[in-house]
């Protein structure tokens, strides 16, 4: 029932109802100014009183009703666990809140009603404007049609009569406007709506219904709840996405604004390589801007592409930033420590390297100084790795000796010995004079900048000629004191001991001149002389301490290996607590065998040691990878070499195991020297230690023999090698190993072809024989012809074919040889273009085996 009917029945008796319904509208607001009105119906329970009047207002409650209400309040308070006063206070607060909500809803309803009226007025004005525009268009169209009709036919009589009837039609909208105004006036007066007004509302409803709305999807998306309907949407906050978009637009505007807003220049840290995405983050720039800049430079790169430090510095400079370049090698900064002060230095023992040609008596001389017999224990009587010893003289002075090999294969060892030494003793045999390795030792000593003391050995032999030695040394800028120079020369004999005291005195004098000092009270550093894998002890490195004191428990880094020093052992096998400057010791505790020549340094912590070794391992792998890529020829290059007739190198793969790292290195270098362009010995794996099963499996997969130098294979490896057919060769002298490899490489060389001339034959007649082809009837004009020999067909002294002789017959018999002046029949292999008058040249090819020099 409507409010109008309720007001009309106010004079009579109100009907008795249980529930009163009050309806209202709630406006739901959306973004972009859109809104939606929703009808909300609230049901209120009407209190029933004991006595009622006709006016519907209840009278005062009876005492029994009041007692009942009080009893209900007491029961409800007891149920909720609160007092009656608290319950009444809560009810009062709820009633006040309901009153406030009703007041707020009333204000909102009034505001919405005003907005509805304003919107209705705007819609009416827009409708009137559209109708006026349509009427104007219709009028112009009719005028144009009238002009065209008048021009087309002036004789028609019916046209002028039809034209006036078209004018009232154009005046129809004003009538409709009048009806609409009349309908609106009737509605405003509260009376019933007339039929034309209802038709006008229906037309407007259809027009609004057919008009598409932009917010249909948005209005249907949200679900209306009572909380959202009663809530105040006037203070809606912006979403985070909207705020982010606004900030992005503002930043784009600033970037596009040019130089109006200068960007802050920051310092960018650049490693050796960096991705564009990481570079953009460090510059606080967008990745798209960096990629766009590279595109302008002609580089099609993506965000995850890597650029070097130079390119990254160029990019950062273009964006107005400064750079600070860092490198992975920075982890080694400060590794060697600072220089020592003069007041901290103390005298140390000189380090003397004995160098010279093989079999000139270097080790025997050292044995005479040490009163030992090291040479007797050397395989083949030659030294094959560096020996480090410290000798105490009768005067109490100490001298550290390094005994280097004299064989040509140990060039690297001699170079390391010269670099780690203070004084070089050049040993020259009096009966053999200067030899190639003597010259090489002189070059190493001069390159290292160390003084030389010449020791002329074997001077007690009957064919000794020390004067020739001194004269030959003049060719290499070694001028001894006897000839007006500064180099000391001493004649010694290791067998009789003659001249040993003079030699030690010369070393002491030279050490005093050099003023050798070191600081023992600092962290130690030195050089690795030799390394090996010892069964039961693990990796063992022979170390020569240069500065500081190496103690047990120190954390050391040696090349790409690190470890904690577990034990220090001298050359006599005694355990040491520490090792001072110029003292050679064996160090146990490393995680691997370092390369000879690597520096060994004490560091503060295991973390620092791991960081340094990881960097060195990465660097070593990178260098090895670059070398393998450079050495590996692509398929196109190989095909081009074959097409050009170039020689393709044949390789002999070898798995090499040695007792010490220096021996493995020396053998590898010697194998490289005996290799040629045609054949090459390639060490696919060279390591220290015994032969294991993994070595056998590697040799089997590579079809390579295993060369063992002073090491042996365990039982499991021997059994596996026998099953797999892998050859293991054992050597104790480097000469024998190199000779076997040289013989194997010689067998891989292609034989040399040598051609021998046999004779000439003239073609007198050509016969065509079935199943044989063309046969030439010839006369031998010079030399002889042999069956199966090589032939060349000459026509006008031009070679037109080269091949082999297929048949050689005299009359009907097959013969092996035809001499000069005799006639015979010849046929060529897979060639028939022979003519009368051609000449045949016969020759024989011999293959001669080649050997490596």
Curated annotation (Swiss-Prot):
GO terms for molecular function: GTP binding; GTPase activity; translation initiation factor activity. Keywords: Cytoplasm, GTP-binding, Initiation factor, Nucleotide-binding, Protein biosynthesis. It is found in: Cytoplasm. Residues 94-161, 196-219, 245-265 have a biased composition (Basic and acidic residues). GTP binds at residues 356-363, 403-407, 457-460. Pfam families: EF-G_D2, GTP_EFTU, IF-2, IF2_assoc, IF2_N. GO terms for cellular component: cytosol. Residues 457-460 are annotated as: G4. Residues 356-363 are annotated as: G1. Residues 493-495 are annotated as: G5. Disulfide bonds: none annotated. Residues 163-176 have a biased composition (Low complexity). Residues 347-515 form the tr-type G domain. Residues 20-32 have a biased composition (Polar residues). Residues 403-406 are annotated as: G3. CDD domains: IF2_eIF5B (cd01887), IF2_mtIF2_II (cd03702), mtIF2_IVc (cd03692). Residues 1-68, 94-265 are annotated as: Disordered. NCBIfam families: IF-2, small_GTP. Belongs to the TRAFAC class translation factor GTPase superfamily. Classic translation factor GTPase family. IF-2 subfamily. This is Translation initiation factor IF-2. The lineage of its organism: Bacteria, Pseudomonadati, Pseudomonadota, Alphaproteobacteria, Hyphomonadales. The gene is infB.
């Amino acid at each position: 029932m409507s409010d109008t009917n309720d007001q009309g029945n106010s004079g009579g008796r109100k009907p008795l109802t249980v529930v009163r319904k009050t309806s209202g509208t709630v406006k739901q607001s959306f973004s972009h100014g859109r809104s939606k009105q929703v009808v909300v119906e609230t049901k209120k329970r009407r209190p029933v009183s004991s006595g009622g009047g006709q006016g519907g207002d209840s009278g005062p409650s009876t005492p029994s009703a009041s007692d009942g209400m009080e009893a209900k309040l007491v029961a409800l308070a007891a149920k909720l666990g609160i007092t009656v006063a608290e319950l009444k206070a809560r009810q009062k607060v709820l009633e006040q809140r309901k009153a406030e909500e009703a007041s707020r809803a009333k204000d909102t309803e009034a505001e919405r009603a005003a907005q509805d009226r304003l919107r209705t007025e705007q819609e009416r004005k827009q409708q009137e404007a559209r109708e006026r525009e349509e009427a104007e268009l219709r009028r112009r169209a009719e005028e144009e049609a009238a002009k065209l009709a008048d021009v087309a036919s002036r004789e028609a009589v019916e046209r002028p009569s039809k034209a006036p009837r078209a004018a009232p039609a154009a005046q129809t909208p004003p009538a409709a406007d009048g009806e609409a105004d009349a309908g609106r006036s009737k509605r405003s007066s509260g009376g019933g709506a007339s039929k034309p007004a209802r038709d006008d509302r229906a037309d407007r409803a259809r027009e609004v219904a057919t008009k598409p709305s932009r917010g249909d999807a948005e209005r249907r998306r949200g679900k209306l709840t009572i909380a959202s309907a009663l809530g105040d949407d006037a203070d809606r906050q912006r979403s985070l996405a909207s705020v982010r978009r606004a900030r992005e637009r503002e930043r784009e505007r600033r970037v596009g604004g040019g130089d109006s807003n200068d960007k802050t220049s920051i310092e960018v840290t650049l490693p050796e390589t960096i991705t564009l995405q990481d570079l953009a983050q460090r510059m606080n720039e967008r990745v798209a801007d960096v990629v766009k800049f590279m595109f302008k430079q002609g580089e099609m790169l993506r965000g995850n592409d890597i650029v070097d430090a130079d390119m990254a510095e160029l990019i950062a400079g273009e964006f107005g930033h400064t750079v600070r370049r860092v490198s992975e090698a920075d982890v080694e900064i400060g590794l060697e420590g600072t220089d020592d002060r003069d007041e901290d230095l103390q005298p140390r023992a000189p380090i003397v390297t004995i160098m010279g040609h093989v079999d000139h008596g270097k080790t025997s001389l050292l044995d005479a100084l040490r009163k030992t017999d090291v040479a007797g224990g050397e395989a083949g009587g030659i030294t094959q790795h560096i020996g480090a010893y410290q000798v105490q003289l009768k005067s109490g002075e100490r001298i550290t000796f390094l005994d280097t090999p004299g064989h040509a294969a140990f060039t690297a060892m001699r170079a390391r010995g010269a670099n780690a030494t203070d004084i070089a003793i050049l040993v020259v045999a009096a009966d053999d004079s200067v030899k190639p390795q003597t010259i090489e030792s002189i070059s190493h000593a001069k390159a290292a900048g160390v003084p030389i003391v010449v020791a002329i050995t074997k001077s007690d032999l009957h064919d000794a000629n020390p004067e020739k030695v001194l004269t030959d040394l003049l060719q290499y800028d070694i001028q001894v004191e006897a000839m007006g120079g500064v180099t000391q020369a001493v004649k010694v004999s290791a067998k009789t001991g003659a001249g040993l005291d003079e030699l030690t005195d010369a070393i002491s004098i030279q050490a005093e001149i050099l003023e050798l000092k070191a600081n023992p009270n600092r962290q130690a550093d030195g050089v690795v002389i030799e390394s090996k894998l010892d069964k039961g002890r693990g990796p063992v490195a022979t170390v020569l301490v240069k500065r500081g004191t190496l103690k047990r428990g120190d954390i050391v880094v040696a090349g790409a290996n690190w470890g904690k020093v577990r034990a220090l052992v001298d050359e006599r096998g005694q355990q040491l607590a520490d090792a001072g400057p110029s003292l050679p010791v064996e160090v146990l505790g490393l995680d691997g065998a370092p390369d000879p020549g690597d520096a060994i340094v004490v560091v503060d912590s295991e973390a620092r040691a791991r960081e340094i070794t990881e960097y060195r391992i990465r660097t070593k792998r990178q260098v090895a990878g670059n070398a393998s890529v450079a050495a590996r020829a692509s398929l196109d290059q190989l095909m081009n070499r074959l097409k050009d007739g170039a020689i393709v190198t044949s390789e002999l793969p070898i798995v090499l195991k040695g007792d010490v790292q220096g021996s493995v290195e020396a053998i590898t270098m010697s194998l490289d020297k005996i290799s040629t362009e045609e054949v090459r010995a390639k060490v696919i794996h060279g390591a220290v230690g015994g032969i294991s099963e993994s070595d056998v499996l590697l040799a089997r997969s590579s079809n390579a023999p295993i060369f063992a130098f002073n090491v042996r294979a365990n039982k499991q490896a021997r059994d596996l090698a026998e099953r797999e057919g892998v050859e293991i060769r054992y050597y104790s002298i480097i000469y024998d190993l190199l000779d076997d490899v040289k013989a194997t490489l010689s067998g891989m060389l292609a034989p040399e072809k040598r051609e021998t001339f046999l004779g000439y034959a003239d073609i007198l007649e050509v016969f065509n024989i079935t199943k044989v082809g063309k046969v030439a009837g010839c006369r031998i004009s010079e030399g002889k012809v042999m069956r199966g020999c090589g032939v060349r067909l000459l026509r006008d002294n031009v070679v037109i074919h080269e091949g082999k002789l297929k048949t050689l017959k005299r009359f009907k018999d097959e013969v092996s040889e035809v001499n000069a002046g005799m006639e015979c029949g010849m046929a060529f292999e897979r060639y028939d273009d022979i003519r009368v008058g051609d000449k045949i040249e016969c020759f024989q090819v011999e293959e001669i085996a080649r050997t490596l020099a």
